[in-house]
Amino acid sequence: MLTLNHVTKYYGKNLANDDISFQVDSGQIAILLGPNGAGKSTIIKCIAGLLRFQGDITIGGHGNKTTEAKRLLAYIPETPAVYDMLTVSEHLEFIRRAYRIEDDGYGERLLERFELADKRDKLGRDLSKGMQQKLSICCGLVHRPKLIIFDEPMVGLDPHAIKELKLLFREQKAQGAALLISTHMIDSVEDYWDVTHIMVNGRFAATQYNRPEELKARSLEDLFLSLIHI
């Protein structure tokens, strides 16, 4: 579903991503794990088409900046992406119109799951940051994307929302979506990942699969800590 080939990104003369290649298949959860400043958010913004880069990125076989690719993609950034003067309900209606999809009640069910149903008439500017983040998640999922990218998804969420989000990860995987989750919090990715790419200084320092033989030899936490302290 998602393929990156030799993606490199500079900010001026500063190298942010160095020759990154990987793929995320349908029904797979991939993790980008690394300390702050490792280049995780930069590579995600490249995938989402927000930054220019060298190399090649495709989504469902389409170039990542094409309309076809964008219809398959959901990008939920670390900083909530909401409009101050739209209500919660109007946010979902805006997304439905943008993607030309009918209201089948899925958006309302997402609001119920994330405890926003009673806030449907509140403006975006009147929501707490945690509520804005939950709304951003609902908006990202309402068009049923095939590739879902989360950047630090647990930040600002309450315990109930974190539980629901983890359940949602598993549900989306079971339904065949590809998920890419960026985080620096190793405990937030336990139990549900298929492959983890550890980023250090803009490049992949290691890749570990969620297989008993690999985890028996060395836990993900031990591998991560050994690499970031080099």
Residues of each region from the PLM?
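Conserved small/polar residues in nucleotide/adenosyl-binding loops
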Residues: I228-I230
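Catalytic Walker B motif of ABC-type/P-loop ATPase nucleotide-binding domains
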Residues: I148-E152
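Conserved ABC ATPase signature
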Residues: L123-G130
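Helix-to-loop junction immediately C-terminal to a conserved catalytic motif
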Residues: A48
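Conserved ABC transporter NBD signature motif
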Residues: G55-A69
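Conserved ABC ATPase "signature" region
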Residues: E93, D104-K119
